[in-house]
Each structure stands twice: as C-alpha cells, then as structure tokens.
Swiss-Prot record:
PANTHER family membership: FXYD DOMAIN-CONTAINING ION TRANSPORT REGULATOR 4 (PTHR14132:SF10), SODIUM/POTASSIUM-TRANSPORTING ATPASE SUBUNIT GAMMA (PTHR14132)
Membrane topology category: Single-pass type I membrane protein
Pfam families: ATP1G1_PLM_MAT8 (PF02038)
Cytoplasmic side: 60-88
Keyword annotations from UniProtKB, A to Z: Cell membrane, Ion transport, Membrane, Potassium, Potassium transport, Signal, Sodium, Sodium transport, Sodium/potassium transport, Transmembrane, Transmembrane helix, Transport
One Gene Ontology term, aspect cellular component: basolateral plasma membrane
Subcellular location as annotated: Cell membrane; Basolateral cell membrane
The protein's assembly and partners: Regulatory subunit of the sodium/potassium-transporting ATPase which is composed of a catalytic alpha subunit, a non-catalytic beta subunit and a regulatory subunit. The regulatory subunit, a member of the FXYD protein family, modulates the enzymatic activity in a tissue- and isoform-specific way by changing affinities of the Na+/K+-ATPase toward Na(+), K(+) or ATP.
InterPro entries assigned: FXYD4 (IPR047283), FXYD_motif (IPR047297), Ion-transport_regulator_FXYD (IPR000272)
Name of protein: FXYD domain-containing ion transport regulator 4
Signal peptide stretch: 1-20
Organism per entry: Mus musculus
Family: Belongs to the FXYD family.
C-alpha cells in the first residue's frame, strides 16, 4: 500500500510539469538568463576578492591598538584554596 501511495504522490507532483509552458519562452515573466546571471556573479565576486586582498596588502587598514593598563589586579586570588572544600 505504501508503494502505491508513493507512486500516486509522485504522479501528482509531476503533473504540473507536463502542463508547463516551454522553458525557452523568453517572453515569460519567469524566464531568467541564468548563464549571464552566473557570469555576472562570478565577476562581481572576483572583483570583491581582489579588492579585499589589495586592501589587506596595502597596509592602510592597520589595527590601532591602544595599550591601556588592565583593570585586573596583578595577581588574582584563587577562589578555591586547599582545605576549604567540605567532604560529604
């Protein structure tokens, strides 16, 4: 029974594809030129990568570290000292 149900659901899922219009219909509002979109994305990504590498190697973006003295004491006192734990 499970095989019949799966086959029926697959048939129902595939029916809209049989009635679909031609995927090459360039006048359709759902037509996308995927090759041009992919090429444009690759070019844009490559330019961003090159710009990032150039910015990192230029040395203009340096981390400015201000050495402020720490507000913590020089030596911290331990929270647990030997002999302070209770034995149950």
């Amino acid at each position: 029974m499970e095989e019949i149900t799966c086959a029926f659901l697959l048939l129902l899922a595939g029916l809209p594809a049989l009635e679909a219009s031609d995927p090459v219909d360039k006048d359709s509002p759902f037509y996308y030129d995927w090759e041009s979109l992919q090429l444009g994305g690759l070019i844009f990504g490559g330019l961003l990568c090159i710009a990032g590498i150039a910015m990192a190697l230029s040395g203009k973006c340096k981390c400015r570290r201000t050495h402020k003295p720490s507000s913590l004491p020089g030596k911290a006192t331990p929270l647990i000292i030997p002999g302070s734990a209770n034995t149950c």
